[in-house]
Amino acid sequence: MTFSERFSAYARLTRLDKPIGILLLLWPTLWGLWLAADGMPDPMILVIFVLGTILMRSAGCAINDFADRKIDPHVSRTRNRPLATGIISSREALLVAAGLSLCAFLLILPLNLLTILLSVPALLLAISYPFTKRFFAMPQAYLGIAFSFGIPMAFAAQTGTVPPLAWLLVLANLFWVIAYDTEYALVDLADDLKIGIKTSAITFGRFDVAGILLCHITFLSILTYAGILLQRGIWFYGALLVALGLVIVQYTMIRNREPARCFQAFLHNNRVGAVIFAGILLDTLI
């Protein structure tokens, strides 16, 4: 392969060509960072967390493709991934994941000890998640914990502590991740049933759409409660109302369970995360 072809293969392995995963991981981290700093996060900490999010999401994708290397060739959406086609070897994927994880760890070394210690379970969750689809009926919940660890790390980095509020935000984000990743799982539902792996879309069964809606409502309800505790203003609650409207739009997209529409609904969650961050930002500025 030429250099450009290999670079393209590595970009696809780490999903740099599809940044939606990075954004969905970044938004709750930014929520936590802004709330922890009351709207004035340390610029160095902000840069470290943005870069760390990109590195760890990319590492997680490489690990995911390694874990699914025997499954992906049998799923229409994933059969052209670099590991599934043999363009990249399993050894290369592991080296990429290890290298990116090491870079992410080195990145946080200037931060306090608590943040560094929290990075250990965060890394273990990211590495182990792809394997939960073999035995755990709700792997999306496990992913929700993994995708939420940026929140306590943000509080630790900014304030030196992890207050109960941080864990409340973790709980909210957990339900959001279950909601949007179940939408994602609906895209591959037919293939996943044939292969025999486990997903929340399969576990919810005929209540899949209702389960997604319930998780979204729970997510927004917990954020509303967090806003009350923090005495947030109109911009925050206005953002939550807009997010609720976006959730209703998603419901109209997934109610017929058409794979293409479910995938669009999944992508739609980037707007939810962005709107909530905008509400937090404006609420602290105005």
UniProtKB/Swiss-Prot annotation:
Disulfide bonds: none
Localization terms from the record: Cell inner membrane
Entry annotated with the keyword Transmembrane helix: yes
Species in which this protein is naturally found: Nitrosomonas eutropha (strain DSM 101675 / C91 / Nm57)
One GO MF term: 4-hydroxybenzoate polyprenyltransferase activity
Name of the gene: ubiA
Catalytic class of the enzyme: transferase
Transmembrane segments: 20-40, 43-63, 83-103, 135-155, 160-180, 209-229, 234-254
Primary location recorded for the protein, binned into one broad class: membrane
Membrane topology: Multi-pass membrane protein
Protein name per UniProt: 4-hydroxybenzoate octaprenyltransferase
UniProt catalytic activity: all-trans-octaprenyl diphosphate + 4-hydroxybenzoate = 4-hydroxy-3-(all-trans-octaprenyl)benzoate + diphosphate
Job of this protein: Catalyzes the prenylation of para-hydroxybenzoate (PHB) with an all-trans polyprenyl group. Mediates the second step in the final reaction sequence of ubiquinone-8 (UQ-8) biosynthesis, which is the condensation of the polyisoprenoid side chain with PHB, generating the first membrane-bound Q intermediate 3-octaprenyl-4-hydroxybenzoate.
